[in-house]
Amino acid sequence: MLLYHTFFRCVDGIPFLSFIFAKIKKMSKPITEFIEKYYLHFNAAALVDASKGYVAHLKDGGKMMITLAGAMSTAELGKILAEMIRQGKVDFISCTGANLEEDLMNLVAHSHYERVPHYRDLTAQDEWDLLERGLNRVTDTCIPEEEAFRRLQKHIVEIWKDAEAKGERYFPHEFMYKMILSGVLEQYYEIPRENSWMIAAAEANLPIVVPGWEDSTMGNIFASYCIKGELKATTMKSGIEYMTYLADWYTKNSGGKGVGFFQIGGGIAGDFPICVVPMLYQDMEMHDIPFWSYFCQISDSTTSYGSYSGAVPNEKITWGKLDITTPKFIVESDATICAPLMFSYILENA
């Protein structure tokens, strides 16, 4: 009887069990609680507003593209981006060739990376010494050339050559997916597989575009094999084919609530895919094609001297990319700080 009264008594007029479940539910959203309590003004408030907008877009049935510029994979954003992919909070990714490969480099060579927290104090000789040790620096993080690049190279080259021998052609990300799903890299794994966004993407067969892939380590390696006559450039599908691939996907997926655009950084990873809308509208004369239906950019770039990456979202209206009514957000801050918080909020609420 005592147990009965304990479970079914009221607390402030609320049944005890309902009170407890509400507390548990509230406690299960620590990031939401934190940012809604303390992130109240300026860029902090913009972060909250943009996160809420992302959640609302998904709840209304919309789809979302995330674009990755900078060194997000080396920053290990994959730890939380992988979960976003697994939980269906992202439907398409556009990234640089560096982000495509550096997630896998971290996967197979993590223990060989070196942090250089005092990087601002390095002399030219210090930088040369890092080079001679086979370490390529990205701000405070050094990527080990032999363990990272070469471990991938010997396997990806085999896959390139095998495809060419069969007369097959694939996109850069499709070749990476083949390598991941073949299992040949598992012998090298140095981080939990759930922390790799590329593994999550490969397993979900997530659509990806990699504009300017040639500007990457694997792109350079592929070019070297073409120069040596061991591969044909046509074995790798081109950037133009990436645009037609994206155009087909956008046309099929932009109905209803439409597709949102979540841009991390600037550069080609964002510039390339956002142009699919004006291309379809103006060049294909598809006048019923919807604009991007949500827009957010995290960037430390400012509007000056013709900077496209630092342009305010409204400028994109003049280019036929966003509508007047498109929810628009810009968080002028460091993506390595903001993106994990925003993704955590989205995972807790969407």
Describe the role of every protein-language-model region.
Residues I24-V90:
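N-terminal glycine-/serine-/threonine-rich phosphate-binding loop
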Residues F42-A45, I268, C275, Q282-A350:
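C-terminal functional extensions of proteins
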Residues E76-K79, L104-H110, N220-S224, P273-V276, ...:
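Short acidic, glycine/serine/threonine-rich loops at helix termini
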Residues D126-T217:
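Ligand-binding beta-strand-loop-alpha-helix segment within the catalytic cores
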Residues M64-S73, I93, V209-W213, A233-Y308:
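Glycine-rich anion-binding loop/nest that anchors nucleotide
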